[in-house]
């Protein structure tokens, strides 16, 4: 008898094969393993002898496909394997679900409980099954208890999430396909050359932010400022104090220092403070990506992928969450009990010692209605490869740190007053009284200072000092992690999409890795410049952030999907009108960028000349440099050549500026 030959069952659709297996094993002690089209699926019976077939998808099985031409507004959902050759592997999953849907009594979407999971399951059931017979399973971890609870509490389809997801797909498709085709058509009509180019609703403002930042760095000229350091002899101590005052002119700093030398100082106040250093809340995805990047240098995209693997292995809760909270419905004690039976036993013993066995989660500010903060499930990890272990260890330690206790620090602060002079300054040292969570989540360091013992009324003398010159610094280059933080602060994308968007920009050769930093390529530079110049609305962060807010409102049922899509089409029409006016200029700019037509190059780089034999950036650098030299002269009293040498030798000086300075020095 073929046990896989069944009918009259309910079809449960999981997002991935690992998830399908976990669901089957949670719902039955002996699930029947079957294979068809080279894909595994499982059959189970419940206590009422109802049959269930658990089948995996492979993520999205459907994608949007529109007509050729420009502009395009309409698209239909088509099987991915038909419209994308790189997704041909999804055909066997499509065939399996299609064949199993024919004999199903009903359908259960058990894909990840987020916007994408809701859309994946909805489209599969709508196109291959019967959406009128569909239900939803919602869980935050692939543990037996979570899956059983979700199975017992099956609900109606989450249409607000589905509508928000479909709106996001349609809007991203509308902007991506039309802006990309506009760029390619402009180039093809002008230079008779077809080149694949792309732009998008979220990726374009992100690219422009990196490019604008890089331009400002290349144009940066450090300016001098001055501070004063003094050496104070008091009791047996020789204290090196940096006075908290800045001077624009060196003469002012020297005059200030001369007045201080040999002055008496007196301790006028001693303050002892004990403060708590609060333990951290559990991770949301962005926090995890930032910490993994800071500690291990792992890219946000890879952090997300590794976390998803750990989730599918049943080791952590669902990672694509914005929440920093763990609700009371989740048993902290059971999780800790599970970790006690793993390699984390010593750490659990330490947490128990710190808390006396009473565990209270440090709840964060951010929340997510769909999922709690990322936390270990309590299942013991076994033989994890190094990359997985690093992420799991971060999550486990962060969770245990969040249920331990705040650290306790003491700060001793001495206020010293200079006699016959309007200046007070402080000297302090920090001591750790109780480490608590710092011993659990040991990735956070607190520096203890060498103690200083002074009393009120103690006197000393300023015996020496010096004037320090410091140069202003440009903003730091973006790393993948800092760019992710900028995207979050600008409300661009979601916690589930930001890391992937950064990787897309690298894959399309708009950005490239430069050590731990990312910088624009020549192509990325030109694309950003063209979008900035001709289509500023597309790269306006406010427009994209506003759209993200509207999509969130769909998810909470506050606005209709159709209204948001209509609004985007109106904005797209405005873009198309602007494009028609600038089409030839866009084509010419792209042709120049790709080297398809000859240009008169800047004497310092490959960009087109703008004025005086210079591109517009080197010309701007020259103008800024002339102004900066005058500021240097006023502040330092240096001669012209010395100023140029100081600017040239500074690591902060931008590339465009250095090119101009080098030429000026060679001409003197």
From Swiss-Prot:
SUPFAM superfamilies: Prokaryotic type I DNA topoisomerase. It holds the Pfam family Toprim. Its cofactor is Mg(2+). The keyword Metal-binding applies. GO terms for molecular function: DNA binding; DNA topoisomerase type I (single strand cut, ATP-independent) activity; metal ion binding. One of its GO terms (biological process) is DNA topological change. Optimum temperature is 75 degrees Celsius for topoisomerase activity. Optimum temperature for decatenase is 75-90 degrees Celsius. Keywords: Disulfide bond, DNA-binding, Isomerase, Metal-binding, Topoisomerase, Zinc. Single-strand (ss)DNA regions and DNA single-stranded binding protein stimulate relaxation. Zn(2+) binds at residues 602, 605, 615, 618. Disulfide bonds join 4-34. The keyword Membrane does not apply. Gene3D superfamilies: 3.40.50.140, Topoisomerase I, domain 2, Topoisomerase I, domain 3, Topoisomerase I, domain 4. It catalyses: ATP-independent breakage of single-stranded DNA, followed by passage and rejoining. Residues 158-576 form the Topo IA-type catalytic domain. Its EC number is 5.6.2.1. The active site is at 318 (o-(5'-phospho-dna)-tyrosine intermediate). Relaxes negatively supercoiled (SC) DNA in an ATP-independent manner at 75 degrees Celsius. From 50-85 degrees Celsius relaxes negatively SC DNA; at up to 100 degrees Celsius it unlinks catenated DNA to form circular double-stranded (ds)DNA molecules. The promotion or prevention of DNA linking/unlinking is temperature-dependent in vitro and probably depends on other factors in vivo. One study found single-stranded binding protein (SSB) does not enhance its activity, while another study found it does. Binds single-stranded (ss)DNA and less well to Holliday junction (HJ) or forked DNA. PANTHER family: DNA TOPOISOMERASE 1 (PTHR11390:SF26), PROKARYOTIC DNA TOPOISOMERASE (PTHR11390). Interacts with helicase Lhr-Core. Belongs to the type IA topoisomerase family. This is DNA topoisomerase 3.
């Amino acid at each position: 008898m073929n046990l896989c030959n069944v009918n009259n069952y309910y079809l449960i659709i999981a997002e991935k094969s690992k998830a399908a297996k976990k669901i089957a094993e949670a719902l039955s002690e002996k699930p029947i393993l079957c294979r068809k089209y080279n894909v595994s699926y499982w059959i189970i019976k419940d206590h009422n002898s109802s049959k269930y077939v658990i089948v995996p998808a492979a993520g999205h099985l459907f994608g949007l496909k529109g007509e050729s031409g420009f502009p395009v507004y309409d698209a239909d959902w088509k099987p991915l394997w038909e419209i994308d050759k790189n997704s041909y592997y999804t055909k066997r999953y499509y065939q399996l679900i299609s064949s199993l849907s024919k004999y199903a009594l009903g359908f259960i979407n058990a894909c990840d409980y987020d916007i994408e999971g809701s859309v994946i399951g909805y489209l599969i059931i709508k196109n291959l099954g019967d959406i009128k017979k569909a239900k939803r399973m919602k869980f935050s971890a692939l543990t037996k208890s979570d899956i059983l609870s979700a199975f017992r509490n099956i609900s109606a389809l989450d249409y607000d999430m589905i509508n928000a997801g479909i709106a996001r797909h349609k809007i991203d498709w509308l902007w991506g396909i039309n802006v990309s085709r506009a760029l390619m058509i402009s180039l093809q009509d002008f230079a008779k050359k077809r080149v694949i180019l792309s732009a998008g609703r979220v990726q374009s403002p992100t690219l422009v932010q990196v490019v604008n930042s890089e331009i400002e760095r290349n144009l940066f000229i450090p300016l001098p400022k001055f501070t004063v350091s003094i050496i104070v002899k008091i009791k047996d101590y020789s204290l090196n104090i940096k006075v908290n005052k800045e001077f624009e002119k060196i003469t002012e700093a020297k005059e200030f220092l001369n007045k201080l030398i040999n002055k008496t100082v007196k301790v006028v106040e001693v303050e002892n403070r004990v403060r708590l250093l609060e333990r951290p809340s559990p991770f949301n995805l962005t926090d995890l990506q930032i910490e993994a990047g800071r500690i291990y240098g792992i890219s946000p995209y890879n952090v997300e992928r590794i976390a998803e693997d750990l989730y599918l292995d049943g080791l952590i809760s669902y990672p694509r969450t914005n929440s920093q909270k763990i609700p009371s419905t989740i048993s902290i004690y059971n999780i800790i009990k599970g970790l006690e039976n793993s390699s984390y036993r010593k750490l659990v013993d330490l947490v128990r010692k710190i808390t006396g066995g009473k565990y209270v989660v440090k709840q964060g500010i951010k929340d997510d209605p769909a999922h709690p903060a990322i936390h270990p499930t309590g299942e013991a990890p076994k033989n994890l490869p190094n990359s997985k272990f690093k992420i799991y260890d971060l999550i486990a330690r962060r969770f245990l740190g969040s249920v331990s206790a705040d650290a306790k620090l003491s700060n001793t602060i001495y206020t010293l007053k200079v006699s016959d002079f309007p200046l007070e300054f402080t000297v302090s040292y920090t001591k750790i009284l109780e480490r608590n969570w710092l011993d659990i989540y040991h990735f956070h360091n607190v520096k203890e200072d060498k103690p200083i013992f002074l009393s009120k009324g103690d006197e000393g003398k300023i015996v020496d000092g010096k004037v320090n010159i410091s140069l202003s610094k440009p903003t730091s280059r973006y790393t993948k992690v800092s760019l992710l933080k900028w995207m979050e602060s600008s409300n661009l994308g979601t916690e589930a999409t930001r890391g992937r968007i950064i990787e897309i920009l690298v894959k399309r050769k708009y950005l490239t890795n430069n050590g731990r930093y990312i910088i624009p390529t020549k192509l990325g530079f030109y694309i950003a410049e063209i979008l900035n110049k001709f289509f500023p609305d597309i790269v306006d962060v406010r427009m994209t952030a506003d759209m993200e807010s509207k999509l969130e409102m769909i998810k909470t049922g506050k606005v209709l999907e159709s209204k948001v899509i209509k609004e985007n089409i109106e904005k797209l029409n405005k873009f198309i009108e602007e494009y028609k006016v600038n089409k030839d200029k866009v084509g010419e700019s792209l042709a120049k960028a790709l080297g398809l037509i000859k240009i008169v190059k800047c004497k310092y780089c490959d960009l087109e000349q703008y004025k005086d034999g210079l591109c517009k950036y080197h010309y701007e650098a020259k103008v800024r440099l002339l102004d900066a030299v005058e500021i240097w002269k006023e502040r330092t009293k240096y001669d012209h050549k010395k100023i140029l040498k100081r600017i040239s030798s500074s690591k902060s000086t931008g590339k465009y500026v250095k090119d101009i300075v080098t030429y000026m020095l060679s001409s003197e």
